[in-house]
Amino acid sequence: MLDLKRIRTDFDVVAKKLATRGVDQETLTTLKELDIKRRELLIKAEEAKAQRNVASAAIAQAKRNKENADEQIAAMQTLSADIKAIDAELADVDANLQSMVTVLPNTPADDVPLGADEDENVEVRRWGTPREFDFETKAHWDLGESLGILDWERGAKVTGSRFLFYKGLGARLERAIYSFMLDEHAKEGYTEVIPPYMVNHDSMFGTGQYPKFKEDTFELADSPFVLIPTAEVPLTNYYRDEIIDGKELPIYFTAMSPSFRSEAGSAGRDTRGLIRLHQFHKVEMVKFAKPEESYQELEKMTANAENILQKLNLPYRVITLCTGDMGFSAAKTYDLEVWIPAQNTYREISSCSNTEDFQARRAQIRYRDEVDGKVRLLHTLNGSGLAVGRTVAAILENYQNEDGSVTIPEVLRPYMGNIDIIKPN
């Protein structure tokens, strides 16, 4: 959530930045007018309360002097009614301000490229060379079926579209991948966490999913709980409403969890395969850092995600998202896109973001500076390290052989009982 004080004192700069995120000028003007109205009401309330205090003192003095105080009593009653009306109006203004500010996206960092959509994202670097096949490649969903490791038909029967069963070596491959990822992140200083897979509405507000993106989630009927869309939500909210000792920062968390998404607005997109599901596993990285260190930590986090792809020997590229393509809470985001041969393109497999103090303000996550003792908002970062199902898809397609078998990447073999190949049934 943006700081109202910052909006007030630096309105033109904030308005210009938010315009690059698609926020219209009318919304910003209304916000400014509401804030001015709020300050005017606060002044009126203070003045009326001061006058009421004077009237109250005059009544007390009149009673001590055994004088008639009817005029002062009437004046105080009028002032009390005025104060009640001002307070009611102020409550309405505060509610309107709060509802507006909570749906405003974060402002982009100064070095984020300007752009309306994904077509204006900027490529930063590439790693690896896409393999040249001397046979016709298959898509991962066809490979999974022919290998007997992915069952889409029964997933649809048991639940519905965008669900599947992993079985046999498919299940082992999935487990091997996320175990490998967690072990790699542990080497980089991340503390592994098994979080709740359901959270409350306050947690969803804290990380920015609520109230704006409620339709993208699965809420449990007649319950205060929501199925997590990503482990970012419980991990970030771990310190909600807390003050952390500054000496402990930065703090690194990692977790593997299922993620549940309604994929509202995705009808017709990626209807086959592992790219877009209602339920999928993802290894998440979350960091809590001091403001002056957060962008250095973003580079490290992105490198941690890249490390996984490099050890799996999967070609990828890193792009900086433009202002119009960034997520709601992000101030800056790097996407990692892995090469998918059957689609002859790169597809997102990780997104690493610095939200600066945007989530910390919503969730009231603060730290006490060890030098001056002051309490300040910290910065939160989050990143996929990686999306497990998409990693399965990338491995199946990049490691496929002409006979329909799939070679297991060397780093995963110790996690699969040294199996080195998955062959068709």
From Swiss-Prot:
Gene Ontology MF: a single term: catalytic activity, acting on a protein
Leading EC class: ligase
Reaction catalyzed: tRNA(Ser) + L-serine + ATP = L-seryl-tRNA(Ser) + AMP + diphosphate + H(+); tRNA(Sec) + L-serine + ATP = L-seryl-tRNA(Sec) + AMP + diphosphate + H(+)
EC number(s) recorded for this UniProt protein: 6.1.1.11
A UniProt-annotated Pfam family: tRNA-synt_2b
Binding site for ATP: R261, S262, E263, E348, I349, S350, S351
Keyword Flavoprotein: no
Protein's cellular compartments: Cytoplasm
UniProt-listed GO biological process terms: selenocysteine biosynthetic process; seryl-tRNA aminoacylation
Keywords, in A-Z order: Aminoacyl-tRNA synthetase, ATP-binding, Cytoplasm, Ligase, Nucleotide-binding, Protein biosynthesis
Function text: Catalyzes the attachment of serine to tRNA(Ser). Is also able to aminoacylate tRNA(Sec) with serine, to form the misacylated tRNA L-seryl-tRNA(Sec), which will be further converted into selenocysteinyl-tRNA(Sec).
Protein name per its UniProtKB record: Serine--tRNA ligase
Organism, scientific name: Streptococcus agalactiae serotype V (strain ATCC BAA-611 / 2603 V/R)
